[in-house]
Amino acid sequence: MAKRDYYEVLGVSKTASDDEIKKAYRKLAMKYHPDRNPDNAEAEDKFKEASEAYEVLSDSEKRSMYDRMGHNAFEGGGGGGFGGFSAEDIFSQFGDIFGGAFGGGGRQQQRQRRGSDLRYVMELSLEEAVRGVKKTITFTAPAPCEVCDGKGSKNPNDVETCRTCHGTGQVRMQQGFFSVQQTCGTCRGQGKIIKNPCQSCHGSGVADRQQTLEVTIPAGVDNGDRVRLSGKGEAVRDGQAGDLYVEVVVREHEIFQRDGADLYMDVPVSIADAALGKEIEIPTLEGRVSLKIPEGTQTGKLFRLRGKGVRPVRSSMVGDLLCRVVVETPVNLTSRQRELFKELQATLDGDEHSSSPKKKSFFDRLFD
């Protein structure tokens, strides 16, 4: 089943402010929270859907990516979607706004740690960017330690639950009328104490490792577009790995220049073909096509080939190819060619106004 538009899920416009997005999510979260709707699968699905939408639209970078690429921005790693995010973590951002409103408001939970997001720059040809491509990338990033299986200790018995916070990673301090939750200083928020750390990772549970992934780049991407690979960023012990963002850089093309959905190119035309007119062949991204050059074509004349441009991500419209004529003046003339040009020059000197319309308008303006 196709995912709904995130703005539609929250019931806000695409120009909604951060505050409007937060209020919309809070309203839906209050309505569909599982504690208010026990054994209601439909309410649980709506709560998760709203939380997923809020996770993206409340983050300026993710929102910008979504506005440009839609759900494609987060489905490049094969796994798709938002496999690792926690709706409860998002929900907890509202703190005491919800505290005590639901059955679980008073219980203490360990906030799951999350690794840092990583960035990988992928260089593409224009053809790859326009058509989409699958590429294999290799990079080095912190991954679960293979010696201790990411536990921080080879022997599970050497890992104890922190006695200060009882494994939650946080402690509650009473300050007057208010109860404040803080990171446990004994275990530093880990919830566990390692008595005998792994010698390979020194108890961190992670180690740098070379990784290889296949990335699917959707058709129509442009410079600066990013694809998110959920959970492929920095790994952390007893926590959620960050994401890997693959940023697209499109190499300069020898023929075409891209501007949004449109492509531009210069078409060299001989002075004879420009004067007399001719049907020529030009390249496009889909193969060669014919272009009719009318008699008397001047440098700078633009011809538009509709539908020969690019279909951007999240668009059903295909741009155009705009061909700019560049009339070439011949060089290294033979003696015969020089004679012919002199003859032509002699015939044009007395009739330059009719044969050179731009020259005529130039001198008319000059002497007005």
Swiss-Prot record:
CDD domains: DnaJ, DnaJ_C, DnaJ_zf
Domain of life where this protein originates: Bacteria
Cofactor(s) needed: Zn(2+)
Chain intervals for the UniProt region annotation (Disordered): 349-368
A GO term from the CC aspect: cytoplasm
GO biological process: chaperone cofactor-dependent protein refolding; DNA replication; protein refolding; response to heat
MF term (GO), any: ATP binding
Zinc finger (CR-type): 132-210
Bias kind Basic and acidic residues: ranges: 350-368
Domain J: 5-70
Entry's localization field: Cytoplasm
The CXXCXGXG motif repeat ranges on this chain: 145-152, 162-169, 184-191, 198-205
This protein's UniProt keywords: Chaperone, Cytoplasm, DNA replication, Metal-binding, Repeat, Stress response, Zinc, Zinc-finger
InterPro entries membership: DnaJ, DnaJ_C, DnaJ_domain, DnaJ_domain_CS, HSP40/DnaJ_pept-bd, HSP_DnaJ_Cys-rich_dom, HSP_DnaJ_Cys-rich_dom_sf, J_dom_sf
SMART domains according to UniProt: DnaJ (SM00271)
Primary localization class, coarse: cytoplasm
Cofactor note: Binds 2 Zn(2+) ions per monomer.
Binding site for Zn(2+) 2: 162, 165, 184, 187
Subunit relationships: Homodimer.
PANTHER family xrefs: CHAPERONE PROTEIN DNAJ, DNAJ HOMOLOG 1, MITOCHONDRIAL-RELATED
Record's function text: Participates actively in the response to hyperosmotic and heat shock by preventing the aggregation of stress-denatured proteins and by disaggregating proteins, also in an autonomous, DnaK-independent fashion. Unfolded proteins bind initially to DnaJ; upon interaction with the DnaJ-bound protein, DnaK hydrolyzes its bound ATP, resulting in the formation of a stable complex. GrpE releases ADP from DnaK; ATP binding to DnaK triggers the release of the substrate protein, thus completing the reaction cycle.
UniProt similarity note: Belongs to the DnaJ family.
HAMAP family, A to Z: DnaJ (MF_01152)
Record remark: domains: The J domain is necessary and sufficient to stimulate DnaK ATPase activity. Zinc center 1 plays an important role in the autonomous, DnaK-independent chaperone activity of DnaJ. Zinc center 2 is essential for interaction with DnaK and for DnaJ activity.
Entry protein name: Chaperone protein DnaJ
Primary gene name: dnaJ
